[in-house]
Amino acid sequence: EGTHHKKISTLFEKLSETPGSRIIVNMPPRHTKSEFASYLLPAWLIGKNPKLKIIQTTHTAELAVRFGRKVRNLMELQVYKDIFPDVDLRIDSKAAGRWETGQGGEYYAAGVGGAITGRGADLLIIDDPHSEQDALSETAMEGAYEWYTSGPRQRLQPGGSIVIVMTRWSLKDLTGKLLKAQGSDVMSDQWDVVEFPAILPSDKVLWPEFWKKEELLRVKASLSLGKWNAQWQQNPTAEEGAIIKKEWWNIWEKEDIPPVSYIMQSYDTAFSKKETADYSAITTWGVFKPNEGDPEAIILMDAQRGRWDFPELKAKALQEYNFWEPDMVI
C-alpha cells in the first residue's frame, strides 16, 4: 500500500458523501489506478447504495466488460455479502458487463465510442479513455472528447458524479480538453484534479514499495522526454504551437560551419548531479546567410548538456565562452 492509495481512498470517501462530484486522477502506468477506480470503488459504492446506477467506460469494450466481471464476482463472494448484507444481484441479469442488483441498481460497461443511449448514471467512471494507438492520433483524441460530451456526459442524472482516472498523453487528451473547457467557461464542470508523478518533486518515488527508483530511471531512459513527462510525470507539453516551429529547421549538410556575422551563447542551468535532476545546457548559435542574397538565418554551432554541480558548471561555462567568444550571452 502506497501513500497515493491512501489519498485516493480519502478522495473516494469524499465522493461518496458529495453529490455532483467531478474528480480527475492522473497517474502513471502500473500504479493500480484501475484496481481502485474500476474495481473497488464501484463494488464499495453499490454496497453502500444498492440502487446506484453506474456506467463504466474505458478505451475498449472488452476491458470495460472485464472490469464489470471483476466487480460482479467480488459481490458474489461471501465476505462481501457479510459486509454488505442488504445488496444482492438479480439472477436474471448477471452478464459480465451488464448486471443489476435486486434493489434496482445497475452496472453498464462500454468502450469509448460505444453506444450508451437509454442508460442513466448516478456515477460515471472513465478509466484510461485513450489507448496507446489513440495517443498517436489527434483525430482519435478529438473523437474521444466528442464521444464523452455527446454520450456519457449526457447520461448523468441530477446529482450524479464523474470519476476520471487516466495516464496523461498530451495536452489534447481528455483531461486536457476538460481542463481547457473549465478554464474558458465558469459554468462548465469544475474538476478536482489530483496528479501523481512517478518521481515526486522531492526526488522520492511515488510508490517505493513497488517501484524502485533505478527501475523508473530505466523506463525514463527508454522513452523520449516528452513521453516520460506526460505518461509518467503527468506533465504533458505542447507538441505544436511553439513560437519556433520544428519545420523551420534544416540540417546543415556541409562539414564546416559557415562564416557567421554574430555569435550568441545561451545557458539553461541547473545545479545538481542527481540522476533525476534536470540537465544544464549550453548552446552556441551563429547568424549567417545560407546563400548570397538570402535573409539572415541562425545555425546551431555547438551544444553541451550535462549534470554539473555549480563549480563544474562555472568552469564549463567559462571554457565555452573563451572558445567561442560570443557577442551576446543569454
Task: Give the ranges of each region predicted by the language model.
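ASCE P-loop NTPase helicase motor core
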Residues: 139-201
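Nucleic-acid-processing active sites and adjacent nucleic-acid-binding tracks
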Residues: 283-330
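Conserved RecA-like ASCE ATPase "motif II neighborhood" in helicase/translocase motors
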Residues: 96-150
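An active-site-proximal beta-strand-loop segment
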Residues: 267-280
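Walker A/P-loop
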Residues: 20-41
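Pre-P-loop entry segment of helicase/translocase ATPase cores
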Residues: 1-22, 268
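ATPase catalytic-site recognition across NTP-hydrolyzing enzymes
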Residues: 203-269
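Conserved nucleotide-state-sensing and coupling region of NTP-binding domains
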Residues: 57-113
